[in-house]
Amino acid sequence: MLPQIPFLLLMFLTLVHGMFYAERYQTPTGIKGPLASPKTQYFIPYAIKSKGIPVRGEQGIPGPPGPTGPRGHPGPSGPPGKPGYGSPGLQGEPGLPGPPGISATGKPGLPGPPGKPGERGPYGHKGDIGPAGLPGPRGPPGPPGIPGPAGISVPGKPGQQGLTGAPGPRGFPGEKGAQGAPGVNGRKGETGYGSPGRPGERGLPGPQGPIGPPGPSGVGRRGENGFPGQPGIKGDRGFPGEMGPSGPPGPQGPPGKQGREGIGKPGAIGSPGQPGIPGEKGHPGAPGIAGPPGAPGFGKQGLPGLRGQRGPAGLPGAPGAKGERGPAGHPGEPGLPGSPGNMGPQGPKGIPGNHGIPGAKGEIGLVGPAGPPGARGARGPPGLDGKTGYPGEPGLNGPKGNPGLPGQKGDPGVGGTPGLRGPVGPVGAKGVPGHNGEAGPRGEPGIPGTRGPTGPPGVPGFPGSKGDPGNPGAPGPAGIATKGLNGPTGPPGPPGPRGHSGEPGLPGPPGPPGPPGQAVMPDGFIKAGQRPRLSGMPLVSANHGVTGMPVSAFTVILSKAYPAVGAPIPFDEILYNRQQHYDPRSGIFTCKIPGIYYFSYHVHVKGTHVWVGLYKNGTPTMYTYDEYSKGYLDQASGSAIMELTENDQVWLQLPNAESNGLYSSEYVHSSFSGFLVAPM
């Protein structure tokens, strides 16, 4: 059965091929060839010419099919046919397995997707304790915490006697008691602990001391008084004559009315006279004004440990390195006042201190009567300029001489060294107690500071030996100046001889207006009530600009870092202060010309935060705060326009001791400026 299958297939193909051949290659025209396609070709039948008569025979009977020819070569593959119509046939049986292929290493495939997280494993065993880590850097100070609830007060056991507390505030001076008997000289007590108290109020001026003996006679020739001539005929106004010697003081007349405030330039300070005879040793003076607090230290605060038992006192150790500044602790309660000790012996005279802060300007005194004009003396020949001598000790003040002729402006002299401070005078009598002042306005609340933990008290060391007297401290903050009562006028002293002419001193403060002069002066010279001129320009123009508007301006620099807290900051290096309205010793600007002013300040911050305020007459006008970043140098500035009247005062001040990191040095300047914008 199987060998007949290929034979039947060949027979089927032969029949199909024969039917296709008969239909394709037999045409009705009798022309051999393929039929024309009705779409692409058009066949036109035509008759073939021949020499004979065309005879067309009848179609014969088709002969029997010939034998099957040999199978031809497979033709070229035709174009793909159109998709047929019909349902797909049944799936054939799987073929025989093919021969094994050649194995070769394939390329690595793409990474698969991440697997699902596995289940949580069991807890491992506890590991050993690791080594202690290094201490981390100090973090920034945290915000102040919420105050905790009030604790339950339980009376505790009485503790041991505490250390002597800080001295309390200075009380009011009591009434002068009767003089007691001198006590036995006691031993000198140890140096106490505590911050210096605030300077007390200024006492009333003491009684005027006795007049000292006149100084030695100065070297020089005094002209003889000429005889008064007879009055001649009044002629033309002549040149001013030499100023004659001052006559003897006349009897004191009745006090006149207070004159108007004069306009003038302060005269030059007179030359120091010959040293006088040293007087007797005076009484010990009152303690000086406390100096400003020192620069804040820097220290790292440790954790408070448990209080141990008190051990034996050890030897005093060597001074350690300066640590970082710790947080300020709370002030302790004032201790009980101790019993007064016996009066010790009088100590040796201390080193003269620096000049104190100038007091308030006193009232203008009464104008005395003018003395009679003296006779004109002969003018001596001018002497040669001598070498500059060393500054002598201050002598006794002689009588005020008559003003001389205006001299030419000399070259600026070399600034002399400040003289030693003279001995303090005797204590004056007790003044009349003043009235209690009205309560001032309540200040604005300050920035809350961070509260640090209180450390345990240290073991007290052995008392050290008495140290050498220290250098005089810097002047402290300005005290509250109270106006004292005018003391009685002392008797006039005998006139001393005229001393040598010294070098011109620094210009002094303006004095009270003098009485109107009676001397007749020619044109071109100073008259009573006339403004002095210098080089054709009024001296009052130093306070006026080019346009005639009044001028008041200053710019100053702070030379030392970390100024005192609670007092005006003394900017002591002057860039411009021609009108002298700013005082570099106190750091206060005093308004002399009422109007609108502009103030500005620029400060640097280092070590801790800074909180600086602009004050007007003791009241803060505005604040500037800068939070310090460790390792950096910050800046802060502020400015304001203010309306000032005469004698108003403006300054900069640090109101808080915990925010006092105001820094200034030789190359990093903190400055303060102000100027008049428009007068009123």
UniProtKB/Swiss-Prot annotation:
One GO term describing the cellular component: receptor complex
PROSITE patterns noted in UniProt: C1Q
Q: Which SMART domains match?
A: C1Q
Q: Which UniProt keywords apply?
A: Calcium, Collagen, Extracellular matrix, Hydroxylation, Metal-binding, Repeat, Secreted, Signal
Q: Enumerate composition-biased segments (Low complexity).
A: 303-321, 373-382, 391-409, 423-433, 442-453
Annotated Gly residues bias: 410-419
Q: Provide the residue span(s) of the region labelled Triple-helical region.
A: 57-519
Region of interest (Nonhelical region (NC1)), residue spans: 520-680
* Keyword hit for Signal: yes
Give the residue ranges for region: Nonhelical region (NC2): 19-56
Question: Quick one: a GO biological-process term for this protein?
Answer: endochondral ossification
Compositional bias ranges of the Pro residues kind = 137-147, 207-216, 506-516
Key word Signal present = yes
Positions contributing to Ca(2+) 2 binding: D634
- Residues that bind Ca(2+) 1, according to the entry? D626, E627, L633, D634
Segments for region (Disordered): 54-531
Provide a Gene Ontology MF annotation, just one.
metal ion binding
Quaternary state and interactors: Homotrimer.
Query: Can you name this protein?
Result: Collagen alpha-1(X) chain
Native organism is Mus musculus
Write the gene name.
Col10a1
